[in-house]
Design a protein with these regions (language model features):
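Nucleotide 5′-phosphate-binding alpha/beta core
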Residues: 1-100, 104, 149, 153-154, ...
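Hydrophobic alpha-helix position signal
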Residues: 8, 121, 173-174
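Phosphate/oxyanion-binding active-site loops and adjacent basic polyanion-contact surfaces
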Residues: 75-84, 111-114, 136-139, 161-165
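Conserved AMP-binding
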Residues: 106-110
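Residues at alpha-helix caps and immediate loop-helix transition turns in enzyme cores, especially N-
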Residues: 113-117, 199-202
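Conserved short alpha-helical elements in the N-terminal third of ANL/AMP-binding
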Residues: 114-128
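Active-site glycine/GP-rich loop and adjacent strand/helix microenvironment
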Residues: 126-295
């Protein structure tokens, strides 16, 4: 990456001398301000080029300035599919693969959630899992039509969406459309926002979820690096125990004002560091990032 090579040179870092973890921690962090917006986009990519690769662009929200466009290739989609494979195996009784309808209700368009979720589930289907996908995005009519007309053809439904939007669908489905969620074998995949255990309990009560630890999971992801981590049964258990145990809460969350997401990651995909109260990420993308201050 010519841009990163220049960044290291300007910061007087000799990459050949970075041999140990301690050495690595001396490398200056990068951010949108000091790195991504300082170089032409192509200079941030492998071999300094964008136009000779099969890429998909995703935009940041632009909430803190102009949107930044991250290119990605199929590697990030594949990493996400590994997390989803673990999730689908967790919800499979006796490891038998159930026929599954995936309703992808994340926003489509330039945002990462909808498309990367579709692509990751599609990869799983191509690996032999009996998965069928529909992508209504945030179109409520299409979501309710999918539940009413398609869900009954499958042994289980995985509903994927932004937590507040998922709650809207569950409430409106019951109150306006007369859907009996407890008759559906529904599972949930969330992303884009942390939520409380009260929220999780609410969905359990509304939908009759049988296994709180296996039947729903929140993904920690970003436009920058895709799906970076996911809740697992053990992380959900630890989080729920911490709600009622101040000592455990302090150990896990170091005095946070509200309960954060607790997720697990694959160190073969990404690395996390805690630095002065913020998170630094190192991970692969078509635009690789080393000690990147993601803003969390």
């Amino acid at each position: 990456m010519p841009g990163y090579k220049d960044f290291l040179k300007k910061n007087k870092v000799n990459a050949d001398k970075i041999k140990t973890w301690t050495d690595f921690q001396s490398v200056p962090p990068v951010s949108k301000q000091n790195y991504l917006r300082q170089y032409p986009l192509g200079q941030l990519c492998f071999d300094g080029k964008l136009d000779n690769k099969a890429l998909v662009f995703t935009a940041t929200s632009g909430s803190t300035g102009p949107p930044f466009y991250f290119p990605r290739d199929e590697v990030l989609d594949g990493q996400y599919s590994v997390y989803l494979e673990n999730f689908i195996n967790n919800i499979s009784e006796k490891k038998r693969r159930k026929s599954t309808l995936v309703i992808d209700a994340f926003g489509m368009g330039v945002w990462i959630g909808g498309l990367i979720t579709y692509q990751a589930w599609r990869m799983l289907a191509l690996r032999g899992y009996p998965i069928t996908i529909i992508t209504p995005g945030i179109n409520k009519k299409e979501i309710f039509d999918a539940f009413n007309n398609l869900a009954g053809h499958f042994e289980q439904v995985v509903f994927c969406g932004y937590p507040p939007f998922v709650k809207d669908i569950i409430d409106e489905g019951e109150e306006v459309h007369g859907i009996n969620w407890k008759k559906m074998n529904i599972k949930f995949l969330f992303a884009a926002e942390a939520f409380s255990e009260t929220y999780r309990n609410y969905l359990i009560q509304k939908t009759g979820i049988k296994n709180v630890y296996r039947d729903m999971a929140n993904v920690y992801g970003s436009a920058d690096l895709g799906a970076m981590a996911i809740e697992t049964p053990i992380s959900i258990l630890a989080r729920r125990l911490a709600v009622d145990d101040d000592a455990l809460f302090k150990i896990l969350f170091n005095g946070a004002n509200k309960i954060p997401t607790l997720a697990q990651f694959n160190p073969g995909f990404i690395n996390f560091e805690a630095s002065e109260g913020s998170i630094l990420c190192t991970g692969y993308n078509a635009l690789p990032l080393v000690r990147y201050a993601i803003g969390d």
